[in-house]
From Swiss-Prot:
The UniProt record lists the keyword Membrane: no
Residues covered by the FBD domain: 354-406
Name the UniProt record assigns to this protein: F-box/FBD/LRR-repeat protein At1g51370
Residue ranges of coiled coil: none
Organism encoding this protein: Arabidopsis thaliana (Mouse-ear cress)
Record bears the keyword Transmembrane: no
Membrane spanning residue stretches: none
Domain F-box per the UniProt entry, residue ranges: 18-64
Amino acid sequence: MVGGKKKTKICDKVSHEEDRISQLPEPLISEILFHLSTKDSVRTSALSTKWRYLWQSVPGLDLDPYASSNTNTIVSFVESFFDSHRDSWIRKLRLDLGYHHDKYDLMSWIDAATTRRIQHLDVHCFHDNKIPLSIYTCTTLVHLRLRWAVLTNPEFVSLPCLKIMHFENVSYPNETTLQKLISGSPVLEELILFSTMYPKGNVLQLRSDTLKRLDINEFIDVVIYAPLLQCLRAKMYSTKNFQIISSGFPAKLDIDFVNTGGRYQKKKVIEDILIDISRVRDLVISSNTWKEFFLYSKSRPLLQFRYISHLNARFYISDLEMLPTLLESCPKLESLILEMVKNQSTRRHGEKREPNVMVSTVPWCLVSSLKFVELKRSIPRYEGEMELVRYVLTNSTVLKKLRLNVYYTKKAKCAFLTELVAIPRCSSTCVVLVL
C-alpha cells in the first residue's frame, strides 16, 4: 500500500458498475421488463431481493403456452396475472396457443383483458377458437393481431383507438363482419389481411378515411375507398385482386405477381398493374413480377414510369440482365435498393450461367438523378458482382452514396476492397460504404 490509500478491488468495481440498472427508478425498470417476454421477465426475480417481485408490476403478458407441457401451471399463472391487475390497466397481451388451444379458456382471458383497458392484443390460436364479442367494443385497443381465429358476427362495433389491425388465416361468418370492423375503427391506419378466409366469391368494399397502409394477398379481392392511403402491398396469382377508387393514389406500391393463368388473362392483368405502377413514386418489385413485365414489353415500346423516384427490387442472379431495362424505364429515379437472391430453379437444374449487366447505352437516371444505391445479397458472392458495382460507379454522374451490404470472409474482403478502390468513379462526391 502506498501513501495509505486502499486500492479498489477490480471485482468490486465491476460488480458496482454491473448493478447500475438496479439503481434506476422502479417504474423505469418495469418499462424495461415490459419489452421482454414474460418468461424472461420472471427470470429477473433471481437477481436480488429487490428484483424478486418487480416483474409482477409489468403491465403486460407475453406467453407461449404451446412450448410448455404443464397446462395447469400456465392456467394458474395467467389467472393470477389477471387477479393482480384487477384494478390496473394491461398494455399488452400476447398468447401463442397453437395446437394446445383446447386446453385454455381463451374467451374468458380476452374478456378479462378488455375490462382492464388492454392496448395491444396478439393471439395465435387455431381453427375453431372463436373471439368473444367483447373485443368489438374495447375502447382502449390500439393494436389487434389475430392468427387462425374465428370471428363472430357482431351487431355493433366501436373501436375508437384501434390503429393497427393484423389478421392472418382468420375466418369470417359472412362478408359484412370485416366491413363492420373497419367502419367501426375511425382512426385505423394499418390493415394487414394475410391468407384471410373471406367468404368465397365476395369482394371486400374497404372504406376508410384514415387508412394509410394496406397489405393484402391472393385470397381476397378488395375495392379500396381510402383517400389517405400511402402504401399498398399486394400479392397476386393470375388475377389482379385490388381496385382503387379515390381521387388520389398511394405513393408506394409493393407488387408481387405470379402468373398461373392463360395468355389473355395474363396480358390483361399486366396492363392493369402497369397503369397503377405508372402513378406511384415508390415501387417495391420482385424478380418474378418484373420478368413478366419484361417479357410483355419485348414487342412493345419501352415501359415508362415517369413518377418513380424510389425503387426497391429483388432480383434472381439469372435475371440481373433485365436491370438496365428497368432503370431505363425509370428516368427520374433517385434511390435504388437492389437485393440479389439465388434462383431456386437454377440451383435445382444445375445451371451455371451468370448474367451480363453491361450495356452499350447508359440509362438516363444514372446520368441525371440517381443519388443513392444499395446493393445487398443473402447469398455467396456471384461472378458478376464486381461488374455490377463497376457499372454503377462508372456511369452514375450524380451518385452521392453507394452502400454495399455484402458478406465476405476476411481474406476475400481484402481482395474485394483492393479491387473496389481501383474502380474510377464518375461522381467525385460519391461515398462508398461496405457493411
